Amino acid sequence: MGRLLDTIDSPTDLKKVPVEQLPALCQEIREQIIQTCARNGGHLGSSLGAVEINVALHHVFSSPQDKLVWDVGHQAYAHKLLTGRREAFRTIRTEGGLAGFPERHESAHDAFGVGHASTAISAALGMIEAKRVTGEPGKVVAVVGDGAMTGGVAFEGLNQAGYLGRNLLVVLNDNEMSISPNVGALSEWFSKKFASRTYNRWRRQVKEFLESVPKGPEAIEIIRHGINATKALVTPGILFEGLGFHYVGPVDGHDVKGLVETFQKLAIFDGPVLLHAITTKGKGYHPAESDKATRGHGLSFFDVATGKPVKKSPGAKAYTDLFAEALCEEMEHDPRVVAITAAMLEGTGLIKAKQRFPDRTYDVGIAEQHAVTFAAGLACEGIRPVVAIYSTFLQRAYDQIIHDVALQKLPVTFALDRGGLVGADGKTHQGAFDLAYLRCVPGLVVMAPSDENELRHMLHTSLQHEGPAALRYPRGAGEGVALEPARVLEIGKGRLVRNVPGKPDVCVVAAGTTLKAALAAAEALAAEGVAATVVDPRFVKPLDEELICAEAARAKRVVTVEEGCLAGGFGTACLEAFERRGLLEAGLGVRRLGIPDEFITHAEQAKQRAWVGIDADAIAAACRALVGDRKARGVA
């Protein structure tokens, strides 16, 4: 007998499956997700925990007329399997394959593109309001989970949704875990769930009693207020009810039959509703369920039988790990240094700091804006905070960087992990914009280390600097250099790492870890008789104009390289310096290499670098073209 899953090419097919067979279908979906994630990596735990929610939603609602909006998108693997992408699912997160997150261009069933947390409620509210304006039929459901309720924007959406009173359904997928364990008083309050029959019976009895008691006599009003106060102490939904939502739950998020029945009732409910579903992250796969740290979040390749990662050949440590070790050294030597992250203890490596310095390491939840202003407050009182955060997520706190940190010249260090191209996570997670959006902030020092030692030196430098500073480093392994003791670098001073005797044909100025590719390109060019010097600028801001402009003028041709967006980035900073010093008018030939004006899709990092033209071959080709073009025009 074949799989039920193989008979489903659309949500319409799913509706034909009897409710009694849905548990078997859920098991098949889990097996498919596990097998695929083992080969491709991905967000295993969240997707396994939300299988029944996915199946029940598609069994009751009619996508794409009814809009299903997934917060973050980690929970949506089953959604992809049920919406005509079963065969293509094996390609998820691979070059040319399905994206790891919902994307509007990929399917009409992906109502909203996601990747960053806490956005679903606001987007869903916009959709239901648009339906009201246009008269278009259909329901809208926002599925919120994976810690997204620790993000302030989720409550901003809830606040307006309750005020407007539209027929919006919010499903709170409560698995007690974000990427790191949920933190904060609000999360702790959520965790005090009452799923027992005793609690639910008591809740029904209180509700029935309150409805039966008439208003009027003072004594009865006192009773009503007293019982309502008691209810407020023990009902998990009181916060949502206070925001204008009808609260339902908690319910078992793995009882697919019960969920179908509940969704059928809620589909005809008038007004905003929040359904509180209790799930287990990694449900049905013991290694993911038992992983208390991440429960299968963002896994690479793993062995299905054990859940253990498939070991790669030994290589250099990841920049994330090197940063974490360097930070722990700084915290060991300076008690003023503290570490802050936004729900990414494992991802940023700060779990090491948390283990060694639990009272000086803060996980603030998915609250990047708060993280930055919290750091600013600490810095005001003499503390040296280090905010470790993915480059793509720091975008969410841009106003706080400018207004709360830079404007006040506070000594906050921003450690930007995943700077540049990130590989399989794709468009929503590329760290493409940080150099551009940080270098325009007055007084902010911006550094890009080219190897592990440079990272150590730059972290140490930032902690001695009496002002704000940022260092950004890529995803993946370092260069494998022998480590040196950390030392203070002179701010705004780069280094000439490859010189040539006499007059060079071209100068390559390579920011950050593009230096390795630039040096390889220079070696290849040397074999062809083209002499190239190579500069490591170290600082994107303040730029070492003396060194860069001197080497550019010496060669009369310069190629800038960065793993960041070309618009407003490092190459633009160099152009501004060349203009200030009259080099452009003097005939300097310039080529800028970096990420073009587009969102780069998912693939291996090496392939992405080749796509955008910043690998060694592309750098060498740009140098050849510049040298050849200049010589062809008779320019020395």
UniProtKB/Swiss-Prot annotation:
Pfam families: DXP_synthase_N, Transket_pyr, Transketolase_C. One of its GO terms (biological process) is thiamine biosynthetic process. Pathway: Metabolic intermediate biosynthesis; 1-deoxy-D-xylulose 5-phosphate biosynthesis; 1-deoxy-D-xylulose 5-phosphate from D-glyceraldehyde 3-phosphate and pyruvate: step 1/1. Mg(2+) binds at residues 146, 175. Binds 1 Mg(2+) ion per subunit. Binds 1 thiamine pyrophosphate per subunit. Thiamine diphosphate binds at residues 74, 115-117, 147-148, 175, 285, 368. It catalyses: D-glyceraldehyde 3-phosphate + pyruvate + H(+) = 1-deoxy-D-xylulose 5-phosphate + CO2. GO terms for cellular component: cytosol. Catalyzes the acyloin condensation reaction between C atoms 2 and 3 of pyruvate and glyceraldehyde 3-phosphate to yield 1-deoxy-D-xylulose-5-phosphate (DXP). Homodimer. This is 1-deoxy-D-xylulose-5-phosphate synthase. The gene is dxs.
